[in-house]
């Protein structure tokens, strides 16, 4: 098995067939809806909130609302659907979450997307939750995760998952690999590659995205959608406290299993960091789209499919030319 990560890979260009990158189409059909970009902000408290979720839905971007305000989920679904927008929520696997799914079914509240969101998703509890959702609200598109192996993908798909999230602890604020010794940190792109060989349904690459070029690489190695945390954090519109350090503006960014999210020191697999303020989120999305259009033009195509077949080379840590500043 070839082991590599994002910074080890460079994609090889093909002959360009477009006059301008603006001809390149970055849209993706994912579940029942079509979106402008194959990216989704991480469902974390410092990345996504209700106001941003509404803006993303209004502008044809995919989002997943986090699950850390459980009581707000039903009002959120009602508000989104009453506004003519799609609802995309997260659930865990505790007993109360199974009851929550039954309550949605009783109230005939059917979110278009439900993400089962736990750190180690290749588990009986996730499989049981997939089956529970499909039994009670079969019309919801179920995303399950996270996994890091082909076996995990197969089992979740066989249980009824419509898409699977791949990535165990490669994110910037995730310390799973340090706390537990397990994870896909350092080989996330290779893990995505081997998982894609087993997948029959869409995969979401989750974690380890440091540059816009990593989005194109994720698609090359099997992702339909790319989940991004730190690159989406610390914008004007982002949740999180703004602080000034040495005359510069920063926003806090922490992991979903950190003590800052959990409010306790036990079973912590995330940390907090401060990310320099990045300005407008709309500008970042526009730049992401333009960079991805350029990627498609280098791939010799006009849409995302062209990225899936390009050749690549493994050149260890070459992408920064030895200069990480």
UniProtKB/Swiss-Prot annotation:
Catalytic activity of the protein: IMP + NH4(+) + NADP(+) = GMP + NADPH + 2 H(+)
GO MF entries: GMP reductase activity
A GO cellular-component term linked to this record: GMP reductase complex
Binding annotation for NADP(+): 203-226
Active site as annotated: 174
Alphabetized UniProt keyword annotations: NADP, Oxidoreductase
Protein name as it appears in the record: GMP reductase
Organism field: Staphylococcus aureus (strain JH9)
Gene that this polypeptide is encoded by: guaC
């Amino acid at each position: 098995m070839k082991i590599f990560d994002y910074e080890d890979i460079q994609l090889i260009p093909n002959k360009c067939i477009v006059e301008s990158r603006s001809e390149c189409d970055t849209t993706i059909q994912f579940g029942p809806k079509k979106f402008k970009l194959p990216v989704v902000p991480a469902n974390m408290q410092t990345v996504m909130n209700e106001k941003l979720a509404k803006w993303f839905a209004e502008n044809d971007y995919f989002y997943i609302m986090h699950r850390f305000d459980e009581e707000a989920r039903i009002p959120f679904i009602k508000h989104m659907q009453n506004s003519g927008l799609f609802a995309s929520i997260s659930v865990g696997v505790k007993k109360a979450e199974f009851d929550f799914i039954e309550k949605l079914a009783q109230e005939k509240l059917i979110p278009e997307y439900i993400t089962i969101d736990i750190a180690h998703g290749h588990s009986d509890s996730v499989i049981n939750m997939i089956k529970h959702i499909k039994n009670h609200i079969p019309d919801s598109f179920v995303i399950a995760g996270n996994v890091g192996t082909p076996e995990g993908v197969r089992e979740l798909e066989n249980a009824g998952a419509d898409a699977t999230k791949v990535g165990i602890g490669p994110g910037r604020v995730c310390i799973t690999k340090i706390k537990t010794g397990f994870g896909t940190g350092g080989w996330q792109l290779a893990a995505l590659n081997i998982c894609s060989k087993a997948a029959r349904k869409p995969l979401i690459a989750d974690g380890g995205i440091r540059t816009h070029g990593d989005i194109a690489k994720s698609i090359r190695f099997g992702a339909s959608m790319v989940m991004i945390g730190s690159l989406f954090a610390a914008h004007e519109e982002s949740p999180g406290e703004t602080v000034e350090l040495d005359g510069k503006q920063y926003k806090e960014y922490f992991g979903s299993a950190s003590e800052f999210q959990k409010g306790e020191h036990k079973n912590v697999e995330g940390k907090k960091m401060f990310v320099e303020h990045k300005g407008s989120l709309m500008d970042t999305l526009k730049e992401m789209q333009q960079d991805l259009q350029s990627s498609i033009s280098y791939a010799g195509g006009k849409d995302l499919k062209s990225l899936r077949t390009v050749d690549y080379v493994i050149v260890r840590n070459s992408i920064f030319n030895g200069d990480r500043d």
